[in-house]
Curated annotation (Swiss-Prot):
The gene is rpmD. SUPFAM superfamilies: Ribosomal protein L30p/L7e. It comes from the Bacteria. This is Large ribosomal subunit protein uL30. GO terms for molecular function: structural constituent of ribosome. GO terms for biological process: translation.
């Protein structure tokens, strides 16, 4: 019998070097010191002129997805939910889009 020379292959697995991470810095706290602060109170007349009250009167379920998103964007969550928002052209445009679902009070 002829003995065959068997070649055994050894696979050497090299480990990848670990990535060194920078040490985590401790979060430092900032102290805010207010000296001689004056509080400015807004009058009710100025806040009433610049705001609009909207009430969700009808359900937005079953409506167009863009109309649903507009209602959520206005911050309304359920029927008879009232929200007071600043009276800006952006808000007015959103109100006009879904006016059939809302009651608006200036």
């Amino acid at each position: 019998m002829v003995e065959e020379n068997k070649i055994v292959k050894k696979v050497i697995v090299t480990k990848k070097p670990t990535i060194k991470k920078a040490p985590v810095k401790a979060a430092f706290k900032k102290e805010v010191v207010v000296k001689n602060a004056t509080v400015i109170k807004k009058t009710q007349t100025s806040s009433k002129r610049n705001t609009v009250n909207i009430t969700l009167v009808k359900s937005f379920h079953g409506r167009l997805p863009s109309h649903r998103a507009t209602i959520v964007g206005l911050g309304l969550k359920r029927i008879n939910h009232i929200k007071e928002l600043k009276d800006t052209p952006e808000i007015r445009g959103m109100i006009n889009k879904v006016a059939y679902l809302l009651k608006v009070e200036d």
